[in-house]
């Protein structure tokens, strides 16, 4: 269940103020049959092969190789693309940014049983071209402490924090923060600022814990989605990476399969 520390909000003045103060917001954009439909779309994408223009990433687990992430799927799945670029999600992103929003990037994290977690980090250092973004984690399956739910730090999103050589938050700062786990039920969405510190543990449960993570920027700064993916792949190529990373920072703690 959602704890009292993380109440769910309807997006309005109170919710926007909560986001501005704390750097996160829990909402409920889906219900009932909508959740089942979204789950079926993710099931479809999981079955895509590795030869398309979308980006699949795989990790090694104690249960064998598993898909850990898919990116750049919006152009190839009309229904999911529409869900992420119109309607309640875009409206919420616009409200939190204070102006019309546009999709910047999207990913699905599958977090299979035995799948790796993510080290404490902020998203902003991995995002190019613009200063402020807002992301959300839409739970496809219940995201619980037992399967590696997100943990956040409230009211710590005013600046980019000191980082180590991997681009993650330094151990000294990590130890100084109060980290709070946020359990997010299927169909709920946890919104967070691009500078909100967050992390997640490995999935020690016997089942996957999937989530979609769309990120939005202010439309006034441009539609930069294609440029983001071009830049990401170029930076991977320049660094000689052939599937050894999922991010432009070193936050993923799983064992990648190249």
Where are these regions (language model features)?
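A short beta-loop-beta micro-motif enriched in histidine and acidic residues
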Residues: 121-133, 177-178, 184, 207
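Short, conserved beta-strand element in jelly-roll/cupin
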Residues: 128-145, 215-219
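Active-site glycine-rich loop that binds ribose-phosphate moieties when present
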Residues: 118-122, 138, 169-176
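Non-heme Fe(II)/2-oxoglutarate
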Residues: 2, 39-40, 48, 52-55, ...
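Short, structured patches in soluble enzyme cores that scaffold and shape functional sites
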Residues: 107, 122, 138-142, 154, ...
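Non-heme Fe(II)-dependent double-stranded beta-helix
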Residues: 1-21, 26-120, 126-127, 233, ...
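Double-stranded beta-helix
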Residues: 17, 143-201, 221, 233-240
């Amino acid at each position: 269940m959602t704890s009292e520390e993380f109440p769910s909000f309807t997006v309005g003045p109170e919710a926007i103020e909560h986001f501005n103060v704390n750097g996160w917001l829990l909402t409920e954009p889906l219900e009932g049959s909508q959740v089942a439909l979204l789950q079926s779309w993710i099931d479809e994408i999981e079955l895509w092969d590795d030869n398309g223009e979308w980006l699949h990433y795989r990790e090694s687990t104690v249960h064998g190789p598993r898909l850990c992430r898919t990116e750049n799927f919006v152009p190839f799945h009309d229904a999911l693309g529409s869900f992420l670029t119109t309607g309640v999600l875009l409206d919420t992103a616009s409200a939190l940014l204070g102006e019309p929003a546009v999709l910047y990037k999207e990913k699905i994290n599958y977090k299979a049983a035995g799948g790796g977690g993510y080290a404490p980090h902020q998203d902003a250092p991995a995002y190019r071209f613009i200063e402020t973004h807002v992301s959300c984690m839409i739970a496809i399956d219940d995201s619980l402490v037992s399967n590696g739910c997100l943990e956040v730090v409230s009211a710590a999103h005013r600046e980019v924090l000191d980082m180590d050589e991997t681009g993650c938050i330094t151990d000294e700062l990590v130890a100084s923060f109060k980290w709070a786990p946020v359990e997010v039920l299927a169909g709920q969405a946890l919104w967070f600022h691009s500078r909100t510190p967050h992390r997640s543990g490995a999935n020690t449960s016997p089942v996957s814990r999937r989530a979609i993570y769309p990120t939005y920027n202010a439309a006034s700064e441009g539609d930069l989605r294609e440029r983001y993916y071009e830049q990401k792949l170029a930076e991977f190529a320049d660094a000689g990476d052939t599937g050894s990373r999922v991010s432009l920072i070193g936050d993923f703690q799983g064992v990648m399969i190249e």
